[in-house]
Amino acid sequence: MAYPTISGPYGLVPVNLIGGRAFVGSTRMVPIRSGYSEHISLGDVVQIDTATGTLVRSAVGTPGATQAVVNGTLGVFLGCEYSSSTGPIYGKNRYQNWAANTVAADAIAYVADDPQQVFKAVALTNTGSASNKVQAAFGQIFLGSNLELVTNYTSNTLAAPTSGNSSGGLCAGSSNAKVTAAAPFRVVGFVNETALSVTTSIPSTVTNATQTPASMTGIYPGMQVSGSGITTPVYVQTVTSSTFTVNSSFTSAAGTNYTFTGAQEVLVAWNFGHHSYANGTGV
């Protein structure tokens, strides 16, 4: 088995702080309203509710060309605590996630609220939906670009995820294009240990953004392409079972190998203004 395997998105995981400073586990404790009716999982982005001043999961919009600021965005959920009146352990218990409609008057969430926090997350395609776990792999060309949040929330009509983990991930813009406009996160690095690289040939000489390689196995949106005829870096935007389309046309050389590289996991930081501590608008 390849090591390590990325089986799906897992939310945002704190790694360190901008500048390489250590993350030592510091969190802010924020109340959750008793009976709050939505699931919150480990790694979900959370915000302050304008009506109650308590913690709720983020109301960020569906991924598109851009993704707007959500006032009150506080950080990432890292668990919670509240008292149980039914046991098995009485008094304050600690939980990895908040199950919708839990009744607990003393519920407190742990939030990674540092606006300079760096997170690790899984790369996803942009399908125009907030419920999407389709894999992407971002090439070096995405460094410094912006990414949008794919929440993949679990409906409160369903049981809370048994793992307690988020299914959120990050995607590029519409049609998987690089984003330079408004979006919550900035790419600051890549996780090399889980990066992908695949080589395949293109049988025919074609001048086009859409090419038909000998094999599409292992080729994902976001991958950077290198090989004959490519003088300016290009990256894959869309894939089908037999073709890939890049952001800029090139002339392929028949029978020549092309290499596709990309990271399944990226390192990101908050963009200025998207975290409430760096936004002058209050809640």
Over which residues does each language-model region extend?
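Protruding loop/beta-arch "assembly-hinge" segments enriched in small, turn-prone residues
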Residues: 1-10, 175-196, 261-283
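Short, positively charged
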Residues: 11-20
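A structural signal for short, hydrophobic beta-strand segments that form beta-sheets
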Residues: 70-73, 77-82, 111, 171-199, ...
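Ser/Thr/Gly-rich low-complexity blocks that favor extended beta-strand/coil architectures
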Residues: 44-70, 149-177, 214-243, 251
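Small/polar beta-strand repeat architecture
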Residues: 82-115, 196-283
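A sequence-level detector for low-complexity, Ser/Thr- and acidic-rich stretches
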Residues: 2-6, 19, 23-140, 145-156
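A generic structural signal for short, non-catalytic loop/turn and secondary-structure boundary residues
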Residues: 70, 114, 142, 178-181, ...
